[in-house]
Amino acid sequence: MIHHVTLETRREDVDDAVAFWALLGFERVEPPSERLASIAVWVQRAGTQVHLLFHDAPVAPARGHTAVVAEEYDDAVARLERAGFECRPSTQDWGSPRCSVVSPGGHRVEVMAFPPNA
């Protein structure tokens, strides 16, 4: 199990990034120390966290991405699209509906109905 992933985000984009992750079922949680809270905001769903690390010039890899399973895939895609995000369908290599969306801050996020070998 992966516990967390860290994505760089400008401080001024944090609220938008938290709102984006909320569309996928993540809730804001407090980091365990003031030091960590001064450098990042955390969101969590089912024990998995995304740490939004403050950076003046964040890097979002062109091909890199974070993938999440959305148990209610169609509902999650509808929420993202209603919020103005473009969900680009991906091939269903293992039969799972999937799409890619770009989060605030420019990170590519793959949303899937179920993972391979589920």
Regions found by a protein language model. Name each.
Residues 1-18, 64-66, 117-118:
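N-terminal beta-strand motif that seeds the catalytic metal site of vicinal oxygen chelate
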Residues 19-23, 79, 105:
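Structural preference for long, well-ordered alpha-helical segments within the folded cores
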Residues 8-49:
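Core segments of cupin and vicinal oxygen chelate
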Residues 35-39, 60, 93-97:
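Short acidic/glycine-enriched loop/turn segments that link adjacent beta-strands
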